Amino acid sequence: MATDGASCEPDLSRAPEDAAGAAAEAAKKEFDVDTLSKSELRMLLSVMEGELEARDLVIEALRARRKEVFIQERYGRFNLNDPFLALQRDYEAGAGDKEKKPVCTNPLSILEAVMAHCKKMQERMSAQLAAAESRQKKLEMEKLQLQALEQEHKKLAARLEEERGKNKQVVLMLVKECKQLSGKVIEEAQKLEDVMAKLEEEKKKTNELEEELSAEKRRSTEMEAQMEKQLSEFDTEREQLRAKLNREEAHTTDLKEEIDKMKKMIEQLKRGSDSKPSLSLPRKTKDRRLVSISVGTEGTVTRSVACQTDLVTESADHVKKLPLTMPVKPSTGSPLVSANAKGSVCTSATMARPGIDRQASHSDLIGSSVPAFPPPSANRIEENGPSTDSTPDPTSSTPPLPSNAAPPTTQTPGIAPQNSQAPPMHSLHSPCANASLHPGLNPRIQAARFRFQGNANDPDQNGNTTQSPPSRDMSPTSRDNLVAKQLARNTVTQALSRFTSPQAGAPSRPGAPPTGDVGTHPPVGRTSLKTHGVARVDRGNPPPIPPKKPGLSQTPSPPHPQLKVIIDSSRASNTGAKVDNKTVASPPSSLPQGNRVTNEDNLPKSSSPQLPPKPSIDLTVAPAGCTVSALATSQVGAWPAATPGLNQPACSDSSLVIPTTIAFCSSINPVSASSCRPGASDSLLVTASGWSPSLTPLLMSGGPAPLAGRPTLLQQAAAQGNVTLLSMLLNEEGLDINYSCEDGHSALYSAAKNGHTDCVRLLLSAEAQINAADKNGFTPLCAAAAQGHFECVELLIAYDANINHAADGGQTPLYLACKNENKECIKLLLEAGTNRSVKTTDGWTPVHAAVDTGNVDSLKLLMYHRIPACGNSFNEEESESGVFDLDGGEESPEGIFKPVVPADLINHANREGWTAAHIAASKGFKNCLEILCRHGGLEPERRDKCNRTVHDVATDDCKHLLENLNALKIPLRISVGEIEPSNCGSDDLECENTICALNIRKQTSWDDFSKAVSQALTNHFQAISSDGWWSLEDVTCNNTTDSNIGLSAASIRSITLGNVPWSVGQSFTQSPWDFMRKNKAEHITVLLSGPQEGCLSSVTYASMIPLQMMQNYLRLVEQYHNVIFHGPEGSLQDYIVHQLALCLKHRQMAAGFSCEIVRAEIDAGFSKEQLLDLFISSACLIPVKQSPSKKKIIIILENLEKSSLSELLRDFLAPLENRSTESPCTFQKGNGMSECYYFHENCFLMGTIAKACLQGSDLLVQQHFRWVQLRWDGEPMQGLLQRFLRRKVVNKFKGQAPSPCDPVCKIVDWALSVWRQLNSCLARLGTPEALLGPKYFLSCPVVPGHAQVTVKWMSKLWNGVIAPRVQEAILSRASVKRQPGFGQTTAKRHPSQGQQAVVKAALSILLNKAVLHGCPLPRAELDQHTADFKGGSFPLSIVSSYNSCNKKKGESGAWRKVNTSPRRKSGRFSLPTWNKPDLSTEGIKNKTISQLNYNRNVSLSKQKSLENDLSLTLNLDQRLSLGSDDEADLVKELQSMCSSKSESDISKIADSRDDLRMFDSSGNNPILSATINNLRMPVSQKEVSPLSSHQTTECSNSKSKTELGVSRVKSFLPVPRSKVTLCSQNTKRSSSSSNTRQIEINNNSKENWNLHKNEHLDKPNK
């Protein structure tokens, strides 16, 4: 007990301290209680509960044992172990209670304090327990929320994993695609490198070629100079030979004595020559045969034989290349010639020499490349090749082989046919083994000779005997006999005709029935292409004799012509053999000799009646009565051979299919004389064969048809159209008129099929079954409709035939009529109310059939023809057909009526899913497709079984049509904005121009639209800047102009679609098509960058001055500050200067400077003081004391030519050149004050002068300014008018440039040539002040169809501008020396009579040579307008015959030293006539008279003009009394212009294209004439040969131009005029008319050579 108490004592003693510490710790823990975790809170609660329980127990124990506790408390802590405790006990015991303080605290107080503390702690614990419970509840709620969040988290995690998997796959795919694309990029880069390498190689090659070309040009010029030299030597040699000839003629008197001896010798030679022709003539005849047969013309022997065999001499004209085909006559009775041999194909072909075989086959297969030389008398002679009239080419097909032999491949040039089963065919014309022919000749020539020698009197097919042509051996004069030529040509034609169908065996007896197997081989079938639409050309010969054919029936009959078929260019054939009609118009070189059977038309065919087939091929009826009808073809989708059909042969169980030929294996029943109405084509046979209508009755009358197993006479009579026999048989009793043969054909069927209307009427009257069908389900109406016998169809319909009867394949009569393009039958059936929508088993409708043939008329009838109202009879057919226009004209039914067929029928698809639109588009039948597209219900997006639309299968033309179905045509315009200022010569410049119309389709994207706009702009810029349809080489100068004006897509400032701005490359949400329709955009406007943007693109387009030159002008202004533009009046100087000033101003303002433009118009009264005030007021001239401002000043001085430059600008030249304060200049103002000024650095001075050149004192100003000369014969003025007028024409035609033959182009071309020729003549006259710029011609009206408007405008321009300027210039020149003191004004006011005459002559010459010449108006119409021109009635003979007697030598060019014309580049216009030697009066008159005498062979009108000129020379001095040398010089110049051959002949304006000869005064300008002579190109002898006799006479009688001088005036030595004449003829071929001035201009080197020649001629005169 004591131990326990002792052990507890220290704790009690420390209780107060622990209580205080515990309170602090409790305070801390209380603060951190919220942060305790769940486990810590539980532990805390358990500890506190333990303490509470322990204290409760202590309290209870202390209460129960209070005393013991007291004692223990007081004494229990003392023990013997601690001496200090004993001392304390003694201390306490030894003293009194009052004096001594207890060592420890009273236990009761301690207990009370502990109890109080425990109560507090219990309260706090209970509060914490309540807080812990509330937290526990929150914790539970948070646990639930956490679980929900965890579940959501799991779901999201799972979804995230799925997304990651998907993304991983996408990433893998993207990586794979990136790899592929990178590979492609590498490949494309490699390809690009290769292409660039190739481009570099091509560039190198082009550079090499250019170098070679330049070397060739140099070589050619050297050769031409050498040729000219040789020609002159030839002239000299000719004169020597002439002299020698005169000497030889002197000896003729001696030779007359020997005439008697020579006559005797001639008689002896004649007697000796009578015996020689028997030996020489056969060889000549043989050669003549070679010529006549091989070429068919009368050329030389060597040439003709070369054309026969040699392929080197191919003509460049593919149109005239005719294949040359000749048959080889097989040896009579030769067993080696097989029955199927065509053109004598030998079975023993191995015996032929390979050389001849290769040559023959190659020349036959490429026979079209052999040139033919037609004689001048015949326009078209094609005896050696296929034509519309001649017999077909035998090599155009390969003969079919028997069924046990493989078909031979079509021979191609250079490839030998290889066939393992059949013997090889080395040539279509291999010579037979036992044919005794000339071994060295071509087999075709041998065959032709054989035909000429043999069969001369063989009977032809009509039983007549043709008389053989006269032999060539009869007489040498027979070659000139026209009858012999005609007969020879007829013989060649007959030989070719026989060659097309050789006899395969002996003809069968007339009485024997035809058999289908006479020989060992089937007959020859043949096809040939015929050109469509070519009219029959009359060659002057009888029609070709038809080929011989054996009888085909039991009784002899007239021969049936070949089924020559005309392939319509808008459709293909439907007879099973699809002939590609594209090969008809192709060049012969690209067409193999053989029919190309199209294997691409994948269209199913139905077995329609095939007698005769639709006109598409040429069927030659084979001999021996063998059957030919059904066409087997390798075409995909064609009728199977076993399909039952009309006229199907019994022997065609397995039809022979040849890839590139057409095999025939069934009988064909020729059409007898049908009952068609007069005026229509009597039958397919006649219309297709090309025979003349006069032969039709003879050929087609009552001929029997092959009956092919018809056992009864009734069927024979019905098939042959024998009405008498048929009526007799019908009157017999017991005869079954409805009897059918094994094919199911009744008599009515046969009669309807062959078109015998009378027989049909008899049978129908005898109540024959009208709807009896054959084994294939075809009724008589089906047969008649298929063959096109519309009268039979009309009769059958009248007897209530079933018009909607469908055969086994579902073919109705309407379907068959559409399939065979029988328009009349279609019309009758439609009027009878037939059903248009009946479908065949293949799903084809009549619309499909009509479209498949490409017949537009049939399709229009189906779609638009309505059933007539009641009361309309068939007799009104003619009147209806007149109203019903099927040609698609303005009154076409589709323009008036709506289609009667529903949309379901138009969109109906056949078994393969093809609609009619699919068929039309795939075959390229654009007209049919267009008609289908007009139907509003057409669905062009309908897809077939292969998921293809109409557009997918269409040809290029049809694709274009489909794409433009709903296309919007929006005009594209170019705008240059407002042209400022308007008073600067810009009145004629247009602000807007329509360049084209853009087709915007539904599927057009914005990228495509952007490309289209850019391409349209580029094309337009190139079109207006290129030479285009102008051929102006005769009037343009030699310097080449840049073809590009510098504009491109980069010149665009903005584009507006209607009113919406748009830029290239920009895209909207809507497509362009929808955007245009929604915004109702009527036009697209392109605005070009202008001066406001600091660019000159709009200025370039408005004025047609190249952009590079405008930029160069701007650079000169910015660099030199002082620039003057000068040129002839009307050269747009003012416009150029103002546009440059605007551009410069906006550039300076964009750089941050203020800028101002100051204009000043200079006139005669403008003084130097006014100019000084202008400079000072505009701050250009600044006082020295004043500091300069940053303002930029642009001063424009206009019309400086009206003032004296030296007087006006003299004081300003020095300060303008040196603009600084260091070089000031003192100027005196108007008030008398003088001050020093200097020109501002920021001042730009520009001036304009309307003068071609400077003169006199004005030249002193020239070095102080930068001058820009605007020459009329150099850029930019030279091509400006051409480009401007071309743009004007394009704008007038809404962007479509017309053809060069259009009258608008011709009249604009004339206006352009007027400006050029006018300036050329004025420059030659030495009057540069009269030169005109292009400004006056910019207002040329362009009115299509009204050329008179332009001529009237030209007359007003001539009278108002040109004539006054020319008059003023001529007067000023004529009076420049005459009145030096008074100036020129007096002379202008009072011109002398001579000056007036000179002016009138000059105006008349200029009017005729420069203005009226080349006008495209007819002469009669031009004469009406000539009176409107001023000065056109002056007699030119006065000028042409004038000469000056008193003129001194050496003064011819004096006036030119003062009056300088524009500087000439490379001798341009430096005419050698200016330095020509003077001619005396006697020389000129003698020359005039001699020229008159030597030109008697010209026309009467020319003779009259020459006589008038001669008479006018008598009173020459009285009429022209000129008083000065300059006037005489001027007249001389006019005289040379009037007579020069380098200018137009003013006396023959209308006939200039036919005759280029000049006046009698053409010799007045000998040097110029010699120059023109020497500039002619040398002409070969071939070109000289066509000269007529009177031209040759003139060539021998004309005077030598080079020999004319003062010392040799009377020389009459002739000079060859062949060069002049032929060059004139060559000139007529070009568009230059008779103006050959280009020859002088374009040959500068030659002109220089002639100038030296002129100097040489001048020397003897001095």
Curated annotation (Swiss-Prot):
Main localization of the protein described in the UniProt heading: cytoplasm
GO CC field: actin cytoskeleton; cell cortex; dendritic spine; FAR/SIN/STRIPAK complex
GO MF annotations in UniProt: protein phosphatase 2A binding
Protein localization: Cytoplasm, Cell cortex; Cell projection, Dendritic spine
InterPro entries found in the cross-reference section: Ankyrin_rpt, Ankyrin_rpt-contain_sf, Cortactin-Actin_Reg, Cortactin-binding_p2_N
ANK repeat start-end pairs: 709-739, 743-772, 776-805, 809-838, 842-871, 912-942
One Pfam family named in its UniProt record: Ank_2
Residue positions where Asymmetric dimethylarginine is found in the record: 498
Entry keyword set: ANK repeat, Cell projection, Coiled coil, Cytoplasm, Methylation, Phosphoprotein, Repeat, Synapse
UniProt feature, compositional bias: Basic and acidic residues: 1649-1662
Coiled coil: 119-276
Residues annotated with Phosphoserine modification: 1524
Compositional bias segments (type: Low complexity): 386-396, 1624-1638
UniProt xrefs under SMART domains: ANK
Biased composition (Polar residues): 411-422, 583-597, 1582-1599, 1639-1648
Region annotation Disordered: where it falls in the sequence: 1-23, 203-222, 361-440, 454-479, 498-618, 1450-1474, 1580-1602, 1618-1662
Biological function: Regulates the dendritic spine distribution of CTTN/cortactin in hippocampal neurons, and thus controls dendritic spinogenesis and dendritic spine maintenance. Associates with the striatin-interacting phosphatase and kinase (STRIPAK) core complex to regulate dendritic spine distribution of the STRIPAK complex in hippocampal neurons.
Subunit structure: Interacts with CTTN/cortactin SH3 domain. Interacts with STRN, STRN4/zinedin and MOB4/phocein; this interactions mediate the association with the STRIPAK core complex and may regulate dendritic spine distribution of the STRIPAK complex in hippocampal neurons. Activation of glutamate receptors weakens the interaction with STRN and STRN4.
Entry protein name: Cortactin-binding protein 2
Organism: Chlorocebus aethiops
